[in-house]
Amino acid sequence: MSSTPRQVDRGVVVFGAGGQVGRAVVTEARRRGLAVTAAVRDPERHRDLAGEGVSLVRCDVTDPAAVAATAHGHTAAVSTVYTPDVPSTDFYGATADALVAGLGTARVRRLVHVGVATTLETAPGTAVHDDPAFPEAYRAFSLGHALALDRLRESDAALDWVVVTPPLDLDRAAPGTGRYRTGGPQVLGERIAQADLAVAVVDELTAPAHHREQIAVAE
């Protein structure tokens, strides 16, 4: 972790807050006393998110202007977005472009993006999804995340991003331990509790330790 913790004094916006990982991040951020803006496509479906310290807003994360308006006044942003309604390469490419542009306009410098395990390397330059035996049904989803990572790498150096990538087994039911390991963009382990993934994400908000890179996390 960073030796000089960052004070997230203006709160954090969580794009994709209505999903399971997004909700876990909101819960962990509030546990630490952070003010949270929960950005979702349809607030009516996620009214339970609103509460003390949590503002619920509508945002199209593929629209740079909407991202900028939503992120304005915040210290940092988290992206846990997903949709089954748009091809993954289109959605994640557009999302990354909108986040880069919108956060730049809003002058939000820190972005923590949650990635997927299949983009991690099994050998230098070879991702899990490059294996010929990788299921074709999941390839487009993984390639969409890989495209988003490429767009972040191409972004202006002013955006301090990190892609936090859990293992394939993201255990949503397991109790959190508050502990996790980190590594580079290689497969690190087999499992992590969703609650501990959220801890790792919020740690990268409050005490940024990784900058403009993909990392793996595992139990």
Protein language model regions, located:
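N-terminal Rossmann NAD(P)H-binding glycine-rich loop of SDR-like oxidoreductase domains
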Residues: 10-32
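Substrate-positioning beta->alpha
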Residues: 144, 190-202
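NAD(P)-cofactor binding segment of oxidoreductase domains
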Residues: 84-111, 147
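Conserved beta-loop-beta element that borders a ligand/cofactor-binding pocket
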Residues: 150-172
